[in-house]
Amino acid sequence: MWIADKWEDYELLDCGGGEKLERWGRQILVRPDPQAIWETPHANRGWKNAQGRYHRSSTGGGHWDKEKLPEQWQMRYRDLTFQCKPMNFKHTGLFPEQAVNWDFAREKIEQADRPIRVLNLFAYTGAASVACAKSGASVCHVDAAKGMVAWAKENAKVSGLADAPIRWIVDDCAGTLSPFCLRRRALG
């Protein structure tokens, strides 16, 4: 198993009772986690001092208590920078556990003896796109949500990659792949 253990700006502080206590840069968040099934006494003061807490609704969705939380903040991972902010369904725009995959992709790109092109589908806020571009790949970033692609562009910018060879596409991934698959079929 690979573990995302190179973070300085992210830390799982405690978990249990269906929740996790995390440090995101300087922000302490409490978010639901259905896999944290054991009980916890919540003795860690961080539980009470969290700047943001997401409350899941029994009817779906939920809401943030975030009076002490900035509207957005930056997180750094190695030589990458990402914008984070509380959004619907407990998310912040970044999945820290995916850092091992960014590292794996970067290692392969840097070891290649040829130019590398990456197609990142369902690319969300672009962490993988930014990581691959930072290592020299040309990237095609595809997500159906215009707001997510705009956020990904901002992540590229704050990572010093505003002019990197990243093609930003707002489209349904199946729509993007259909012409490619048709061309491939025609070529045999």
Annotate each predicted stretch with a short phrase.
Residues 96-113:
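Conserved alpha-helix/loop element of class I SAM-dependent methyltransferases that forms part
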Residues 1-4:
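N-terminal accessory targeting/assembly segments
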Residues 138-143:
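Conserved SAM-binding motif I beta-strand of class I
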